[in-house]
Swiss-Prot record:
It holds the Pfam family Rhodanese. SUPFAM superfamilies: Rhodanese/Cell cycle control phosphatase. InterPro entries: Rhodanese-like_dom (IPR001763), Rhodanese-like_dom_sf (IPR036873). It comes from Buchnera aphidicola subsp. Acyrthosiphon pisum (strain APS) (Acyrthosiphon pisum symbiotic bacterium). CDD domains: RHOD. This is Uncharacterized protein BU052. Residues 50-140 form the Rhodanese domain.
Amino acid sequence: MQDVIFFLSKHILLISIWIFCFIAAVFFITRTLLSKSKMINNFQAIKLINQDKAIVVDTRSLESFKEGHILNSINVPLKNIFLGKIKEIEIYKMFPIILVLSDTYKVNACIKKFFEYGFNRVYILKNGLYYWKTDNLPLIVNDK
């Protein structure tokens, strides 16, 4: 027991760092488990689309949307979400929503808005369309 006390007294900084890391890990794990939304990868998104009839909401600009988007996705630019202009997707409140975001720093604010609008099952496509493209998954291109 004296050896433990001696070790602790000589290595205060090391012990402090370990305690900080432990608290941070517990915080992030708890936050992830209690979060209402989840970050999903491409294959989880495909499974949600095929099995649960998830609706893909692409929050990128119309120009980016026309350059390539997921089949049957609905374009609702991020600014419209924050302004409350979501008439196109209000009828889908009972379905899971998969968000395609280009501005990852606005994820939390966007999710909060969707929960305020009454959507209960909101998912975020991890890394937006970047990994969708790198996995060679199909994109629809509109030239109009």
